């Protein structure tokens, strides 16, 4: 295995420039699906998409967590890994990881500058034919392949952006195709039935490959199975060839016994909460077994070491303990239900303060109905909703969220509305801290909300100035709003410190993906 060290030198100006150039390109939802533009780009770069074997992952929920588990297991086998996932929480470099860490700023910027002339050539070729230039997601997919070839890596873990057949990542030939649980999401792009969505996702199954599927709705499973047979691919399904044998709660996560394709693995510690993460672990284990051929068990000590190192930011992530603050990026009803079950099991709170923001293309009514069922109808806990929005142009306005929550059956007395996320967070945390019984804050509903909350809460209390999902000029204006001052004061109060004025240049941060980005929320 090749070893490489990186200078730990951040380059925020370079990242901001490159990210701006990416954001200047069209988002995926503004054009018809295609693969020829990405295929042309990777070909003129020397077929960089063939530089390493690929494990390709699609599905509706659990893709990123499964990708991280696969990565960790491969790292435990001393393989050099490249992982491509989307979207990011705080920095665009998170989308492209080497050996489990975001690619260094210097590498991200250098490789982008090296491939940009070739991307421009493809842009010109397609423009001459009256077709759109490379989009944001097409371009960053090509960048990922180029970085993985530049490193190089031993194996690529490749997460689909949206769908499968027409996703930019599908120019790669995955030797293992992983399908996480499939449900209804992105219906505006993939179709409004499970059959249509499953057919699209089955498109990543390659000839003579290996399909590893989570437990699925029978209609979905049938489509995946038929596709695998047509492609002469091997296949294995959770609950049939592999799965979770036993599961028990443990401090900081859970203890699992997993049945893989070729062996059983008892007492595996997974530092993530929830039955759904146990199922993701079984999916990841089977995928890695399949990568190594599928006919021999892996060494238990290596599997144990791999799972012990798994982290999945923004997935039931406890970011603060006093008061308890948990972030979860679930953004559709299926994901919210799984996360809610896990949250209640892991934390057993008597008071739940939920800060919720949802993007416009999502099933907001379905999300609120699940929240009501999980936290109001089926528990004795006190539940309050703090409705707000990220800075994404796609975010549903808090007042509109309130109407949807009321339609979902929530009592208006437990709902409060905030124009700014920092204010909603601050008030929810203050209320949770001073409850007489166990209380905590759950932030959920959107990857963009989670990313912004993570940035806000990761800062020292006296420096907690809101970093909005906007361009730098807008950030400067936002840094002086009343809500920012309130957030800083309350955060300082919670930390027992006096708030102090922060120089404007210290309050600025890079913009997160906004409405010009790919609409995917993994």
Name each region found by the language model.
Residues 390-392, 463-522:
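Short, flexible loop segments at boundaries between secondary-structure elements
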Residues 51, 155-158, 167-178, 182-186, ...:
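Nucleotide phosphate-binding/pyrophosphate-handling subdomain across enzymes
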Residues 1-59, 65-79, 83-84, 124-131, ...:
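Short functional linear segments
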Residues 84-87, 214-215, 229-249, 269-275, ...:
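Beta-strand->loop->alpha-helix junctions that form or flank phosphate-binding loops
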Residues 10, 40-50, 76-172, 188-190, ...:
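ATP-dependent carboxylate-amine ligase catalytic core
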Residues 122-129, 152-159, 174-267, 281-304:
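Acidic, Mg2+-coordinating active-site environments of NTP-dependent enzymes
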Residues 70, 165-175, 454-457:
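Short Gly/Thr/Asp-enriched flexible loops that form oxyanion-binding sites at enzyme active sites
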Residues 217-227, 232, 252, 324-326, ...:
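C-terminal helical cap/extension that packs against the catalytic core
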């Amino acid at each position: 295995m090749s070893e490489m060290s990186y200078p730990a030198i951040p380059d925020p100006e370079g990242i901001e420039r490159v990210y701006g150039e990416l954001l200047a390109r069209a988002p995926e939802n503004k054009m018809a699906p295609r693969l020829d533009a990405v295929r042309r780009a990777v070909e003129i770069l020397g077929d960089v998409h063939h530089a390493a074997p690929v494990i390709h992952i699609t599905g509706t929920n659990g893709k990123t967590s499964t990708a991280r588990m696969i990565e960790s297991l491969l790292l435990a086998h001393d393989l050099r890994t490249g992982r491509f996932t989307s979207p990011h929480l705080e920095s665009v470099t998170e989308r492209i990881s080497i050996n489990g860490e975001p690619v260094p700023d210097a590498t991200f910027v250098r490789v982008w500058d090296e491939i940009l002339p070739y991307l421009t050539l493809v842009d010109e070729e397609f423009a001459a034919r009256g077709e759109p230039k490379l989009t944001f997601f097409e371009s960053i997919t090509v960048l990922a392949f180029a970085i993985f070839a530049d490193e190089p890596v031993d194996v690529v873990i490749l997460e689909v952006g949206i769908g499968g057949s027409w996703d930019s990542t599908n120019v790669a030939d995955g030797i293992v195709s992983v399908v996480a649980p499939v449900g209804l999401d992105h219906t505006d792009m993939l179709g409004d039935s499970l059959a249509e969505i499953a057919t699209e996702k089955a498109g990543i199954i390659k000839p003579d490959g290996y399909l590893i599927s989570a437990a699925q709705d029978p209609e979905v499973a049938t489509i995946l199975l038929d596709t695998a047979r047509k492609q002469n691919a091997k296949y294995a399904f959770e609950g049939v060839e592999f799965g979770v044998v036993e599961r028990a709660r443990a401090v900081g996560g859970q203890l699992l016994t997993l049945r893989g394709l070729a062996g059983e693995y008892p007492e595996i510690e997974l530092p993530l909460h929830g039955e759904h993460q146990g199922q993701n672990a079984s999916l990841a284990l089977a995928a890695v077994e399949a990568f190594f051929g599928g006919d021999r068990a892996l060494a238990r000590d290596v599997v144990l070491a791999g799972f012990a190192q798994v982290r999945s930011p923004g997935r039931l992530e406890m970011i603060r303990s006093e008061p308890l603050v948990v972030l979860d990026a679930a953004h559709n009803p299926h994901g919210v239900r799984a996360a809610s079950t896990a949250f209640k099991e892991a934390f057993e709170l008597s008071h739940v303060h939920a800060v919720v923001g949802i993007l416009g293309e999502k099933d907001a009514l379905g999300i609120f109905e699940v929240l009501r069922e999980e936290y109001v109808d089926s528990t004795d806990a006190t539940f309050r909703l703090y409705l707000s929005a990220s800075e994404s142009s796609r975010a549903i306005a808090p007042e509109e969220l309130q109407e949807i929550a009321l339609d979902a059956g929530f009592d208006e007395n437990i709902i409060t509305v905030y124009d700014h996320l920092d204010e909603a967070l601050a008030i929810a945390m203050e209320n949770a801290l001073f409850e007489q019984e166990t209380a905590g804050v759950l932030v959920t509903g959107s990857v963009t909300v989670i990313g912004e909350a993570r940035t806000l809460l990761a800062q020292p209390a006296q420096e907690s100035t809101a970093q909005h999902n906007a361009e730098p000029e807008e950030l400067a204006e936002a840094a002086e709003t009343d809500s920012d001052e309130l957030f800083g004061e309350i955060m300082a109060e919670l930390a027992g410190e006096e708030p102090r004025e922060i120089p404007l240049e210290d309050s600025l941060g890079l913009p997160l993906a906004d409405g010009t980005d790919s609409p995917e929320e993994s």
